[in-house]
Amino acid sequence: SDAHSLFHYFLTGIISSNGKQFRIPPHEWGLVVIFQNYLKNLQTIWDSSELQKAIQLKIQDDNVECDIQVKKLPDFQKDIFHSIISGKTSPEVKKLAQTILRNEQESFINLSPKYWAKDISEKVFILHGLNDSMVPFTESIQLAGYLPNTELCVSCLLEHKEISLNGGFFFNFKELFKLLQFHAKLFSHYEN
């Protein structure tokens, strides 16, 4: 729910909650989204337009054209591209991302609920997967803390776009019950 914590997660895979640290390998699309949206604003001593084009082709799932575009890039830009696309941050990508974070501070303040969520008076229901690698669960915990009227459910059964049933029968049953309670509150709220 704020740019600093998300950038830290995308660059390290480490998240913190209640004084504990967790390591969840970040989904590669986190870096892709950052560079897709902000690389064009970054002043570099090299032209980033061809790298931007390669990233855009990857997003469009045009793998043939993307491969052709990547082959045209200078070696250091190929390394940057592969680091971004793989989600494994090289020192250069880390440096670029940190520069983006500094340069885009105003934009990130406008996007970060940390600065405006307190103004939302309606009840907000947040459901998040504990092992979501796109956006870590700690962001939902922070968001729930910023909102004045919220119901939060973090479930071990949910991952990004997937359901995980790796916990054993009783654990899964307990998690399903927690999800049912959350949904009951949600439906009850909107029935009234």
Task: Set out the residue ranges of the language-model regions.
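Catalytic active-site module of serine/aspartate enzymes centered on a nucleophile-bearing elbow/loop
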Residues: 163-192
